[in-house]
C-alpha cells in the first residue's frame, strides 16, 4: 500500500517510450481523464515532471508556491510522469548542458511568476534535454532527463540501465505494477542508501497536498 508520508505515485519512462505514450493517450485515454505536458500545451511548465495525468471533476492543490498549474482547464488529482533519457558516465560530457539548464531554470520561474509565458526559454530548455539524450543514445546509463533541475548537477540521478530494465512486476493493492529490475540499487540512488530507515515520527505525515476534493 501507500506510505503515509509519501502520498503520491509516479510513473517514469524513457523519452523514446514517452513519445509513444503521448500518441496512445490521445487515442485511448478515457474521457474522465486528461493529460497535460509541454509537448501539447505551451502553458505547461517543463520544470515540473514531464507530464501530469489528471482526473476531471476533482481538485488538488499542491504544496508548491513557485510553479503553479497554468493549464487551468483541470486542477484534478494526478499522477506525475517523469521522463528518463540516456546519460553520459563522463562528467566532462555530462555537465555543460546540465549546467546550462540549471542556469535557464530560475528565469523560467521568474517570468512565470510575473504572469508571462516564456515559451522561448521553455523550448530552449526542453531542446537541451532532448539534445543531451540524443548525444548519449545507447548509453548504459540512464536517468531523469535534463528538464529535472531540482537536484545538484554535480550529483544527478543517474542509474545503470541494467538496474532498471527489464522491469519486473510486483503486486500493489489489487493490481500488478512494473518496478526497476534491481529495486535496491535504484532506490539507493533515487532516495538514499538509508531508504529503509523510518523518518522521525513528526515527519511521518503527507507532504504533497494542501487541499483535495474528490
Q: Residues of each region from the PLM?
A:
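Catalytic metal-binding acidic patch
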Residues: 1-22, 174
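Conserved catalytic core of two-metal-ion nucleotidyltransferases
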Residues: 25-88, 108, 115-191, 196-214
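A short secondary-structure junction signal
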Residues: 91-96
